[in-house]
Amino acid sequence: MSLLSRQVQPAETYLAKLTSADWATLAKRRVLLKGGKGKYGVMVATPVDAETAWAVLTDYDNFHRFLPTVVESRVIQSEGGRTIVEQLDRRRILLSTVESTVRTENLEIDRQQISFRLLEGNLQHMYGHWRLDAAPEALVGKAAHLLVSQQVHAEADVGPFKSMFYNLFETSLVDTVKAIRAEMERRAAASETVKS
């Protein structure tokens, strides 16, 4: 039994929190990062269809092929819409390379949201969700059909290095969502090439 919520917040409520400046950022294909100190929202707009986007978000076994710091990824357990994923993460921090193994529980809801939480890893806690929502044409333009977003809460016990952790985590969030959008768009382009 999962401890994750199966509730999907209505898109209207979710998107109503965005300002006109936020929509302008998304319309320019920039990454929108909001929040701080361990509580973040990150969002991008993309022209891909929801099916392609969902396929990328749930391609757990292949995260290492397109996520920047993931060097190994595998499904440990899968049952219905619940999947346990283990990833080996490798990144440069200052003058050294740091590796960590992270195990997450992921709960897929209505092909629109993936709620996740950390089961094992080097953080005190991490939980949140990925979402796919239709992009309002009037706000982001005709070129984007879909909004891909992640809400995440994360905390690490790093003592006096907490601000450095937050900076690294924020950079990682932006790099990850850029890589996910790039993979979605690569797959959509490959699919179009096959069709023509």
Language-model features: locations:
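Hydrophobic ligand-binding cavity/cleft-lining segments
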Residues: 2-82
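Beta-strand elements of well-folded, non-transmembrane domains
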Residues: 46-50, 89-93, 106-110, 122, ...
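Soluble, non-transmembrane catalytic domains of enzymes that act on hydrophobic metabolites at membranes
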Residues: 128-129, 172-176, 193-196
